[in-house]
Structures are given as C-alpha cells and as structure tokens.
Amino acid sequence: MRVAVLSGAGISAESGVPTFRDDKNGLWARFDPYELSSTQGWLRNPERVWGWYLWRHYLVANVEPNDGHRAIAAWQDHAEVSVITQNVDDLHERAGSGAVHHLHGSLFEFRCARCGVPYTDALPEMPEPAIEVEPPVCDCGGLIRPDIVWFGEPLPEEPWRSAVEATGSADVMVVVGTSAIVYPAAGLPDLALARGTAVIEVNPEPTPLSGSATISIRESASQALPGLLERLPALLK
C-alpha cells in the first residue's frame, strides 16, 4: 500500500514548536510577520530577519518528535510512505521518516542569497532571542539566508514535483494538522480525491477540506495516528 501524508503546523505544535506569537518575552510580537518572512523584509533589515530565524532554529532543535511523528515513521514497516510537509522543522526526519518532501524549505538548511551556494558552517547557540544579528557572509560577498520559502517566493521545484507524484500514486492520503488554506499545498488532497483516492483528514478543528474528505477525524495527530494504519480497512468500509 502507498500512503501519502500531508502535514502542517498542527502536528508540530504538539511538540511545542513555537509560532510567531509564542515568544514569551514579547520581543517579536510587535513585528509584522511579513517583515520577518519576505524578500522585502530581508532586503530592508537582514539582521532582524536573521535574528528571528536563528532563534527559531535554536528552539526547534530543542524540541522532540511526538507520537504523531513517530506513528508516521512506523508506518514504513507496513507501507510505502511519502511525507509531504508544509513545516520547516526536521521532526519527521528525527522520528525516522525516510522520504520527506519540504514544500516550504527547512530551518536547518541555509544558502547564499546572492549565488545560492549552500552554507554548512555551524550556527551559534541562541537560547535567548535577539532583535538583530549579523548574518554570515558568503565567499562571493552575499549574505547567508535561511533556505525557507518566504511570502511571494515559488515553491522549490523538486519537492513540489515529488509531492505531486506521491499524491498521484497513493492508495490513501492522510492530511494532518493543516489548515487546508495555504496553496498550492492545499490543492493536493483535491488532486487525490479527483483520482478516487481516499483522503483521511486528522484535525481537532474543521477545515475547508472537511466537507470533501473521505473521513475527518476530530483528534490531534498524537491521538489519531498511532494505530490508524491498522484501522484503515474498517474506517474505509
């Protein structure tokens, strides 16, 4: 059996991955998210953007995968599993998932904003947020930026192509922790449904996908995903 998993922020929130508004110090709450997650914001103030992502990099590195991540990884023992994620953390990989396609980039990959060369040097620890931090400089003179898809930027071609292929060949698609409003990723379940593929939504709250999904499970990822593969035949009767 081939299983395609589309995951969003909900699954990582259970591990304590912070959102923009989760800064307990309130240091970042006064900034528009667009200013920290766009090419325009980067060009205006690369030190501020780098400080924001350096802090998030540190925070995400210090949380652990949850039962939802581990359940998806365990499915590999019984099925061919492809993970398509809108998340920029590495929790699927750390849980043991093999094929993970990051549609929005990764907090753990960096590149030169000018020449595109990957940056692999170690980053400084940042247990406390700082408003502005000087980004590293590439040999070409360009600044190093996170390899994240910012507002207005296209999705990376290879992960998107792999996501479409995995969706097109899946026997079942599990959509977990996503709001189903961020396109083009939100269109993948529709692609699966158009092929006659069963789409199982796992989300504590209703989403725009809920009405068309084959099954909607109103539970969190860590509640619903362990044992879900074994329950599929009964659920899909």
Curated annotation (Swiss-Prot):
Pfam name, any one: SIR2
Principal location class: cytoplasm
Name the record gives this protein: NAD-dependent protein deacylase
HAMAP family: Sirtuin_ClassIII
Entry annotated with the keyword Lyase: no
Cofactor: Zn(2+)
Residues forming the catalytic site: H104 (proton acceptor)
Molecular function as annotated in GO: histone deacetylase activity, NAD-dependent; NAD+ binding; NAD-dependent protein lysine deacetylase activity; protein-malonyllysine demalonylase activity; protein-succinyllysine desuccinylase activity; zinc ion binding
Deacetylase sirtuin-type domain residues: 1-235
Positions with a binding annotation for substrate: Y53, R56
Gene that this sequence comes from: cobB
Thermal profile of function: Optimum temperature is 25 degrees Celsius.
A GO cellular-component term linked to this record: cytoplasm
Job of this protein: NAD-dependent lysine deacetylase and desuccinylase that specifically removes acetyl and succinyl groups on target proteins. Modulates the activities of several proteins which are inactive in their acylated form.
Keywords from the UniProt entry: ADP-ribosylation, Cytoplasm, DNA damage, DNA repair, Metal-binding, NAD, Transferase, Zinc
Domain text: 2 residues (Tyr-53 and Arg-56) present in a large hydrophobic pocket are probably involved in substrate specificity. They are important for desuccinylation activity, but dispensable for deacetylation activity.
Residues the record lists as binding NAD(+): 8-28, 86-89, 177-179, 203-205, 221
Gene3D superfamilies (UniProt xref): SIR2/SIRT2 'Small Domain, TPP-binding domain
Locations listed in the record: Cytoplasm
Activation/inhibition comment: Inhibited by 2-hydroxy-1-naphthaldehyde and nicotinamide.
Family statement drawn from the similarity comment of this UniProt entry: Belongs to the sirtuin family. Class III subfamily.
Stated pH dependence: Optimum pH is 9.0.
GO biological process, one term: protein auto-ADP-ribosylation
PROSITE patterns given in the database record: SIRTUIN (PS50305)
